[in-house]
């Protein structure tokens, strides 16, 4: 993961919704997909969230949410440095950044150019959960 990180004091950490869903291949698959939909619906429109979806550990996709923005990171296997989203449609300030919070309170800061609109990032999570692949 690329990005600057700093640990904030406990009184400065905002509320963060944490979602962890494993999508198995067997009979429990549909229940896991329904659980994911319910969890995604619980993320407040103006808040922060850390969402992890995996398929029996790997591959795994992480979505960090800050309001109307979402940043994605895919891990293919244990120890993978992973790869993260870049939004080729971004036309704003190249130095602009967004902060995200992990469920443990850690604050990460990434370029806004790496974020997608929240709904597009959430749709990528849905596609990954259903197909085991990261959408184009």
Task: Give the role of each language-model region.
Residues 1-119, 123-136:
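Acidic (Asp/Glu-rich) sequence patches and key acidic residues
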């Amino acid at each position: 993961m690329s990005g600057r990180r700093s640990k904030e004091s406990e009184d400065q950490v905002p509320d963060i919704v944490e979602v962890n869903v494993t999508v198995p291949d067997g009979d429990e698959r549909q229940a896991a997909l329904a659980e994911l939909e319910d969890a995604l619906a619980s993320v407040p429109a103006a808040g922060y969230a850390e969402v992890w979806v995996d398929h029996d550990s790997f591959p795994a996709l992480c979505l960090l949410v800050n309001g109307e923005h979402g940043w994605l990171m895919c891990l293919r296997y244990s120890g993978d440095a992973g790869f993260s989203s870049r939004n080729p449609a971004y036309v704003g300030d190249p130095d602009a950044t967004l902060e995200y919070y992990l469920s443990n309170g850690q604050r990460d800061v990434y370029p806004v150019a790496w974020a997608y609109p929240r709904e597009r990032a959430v749709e990528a999570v849905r596609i990954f959960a259903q197909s085991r692949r990261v959408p184009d």
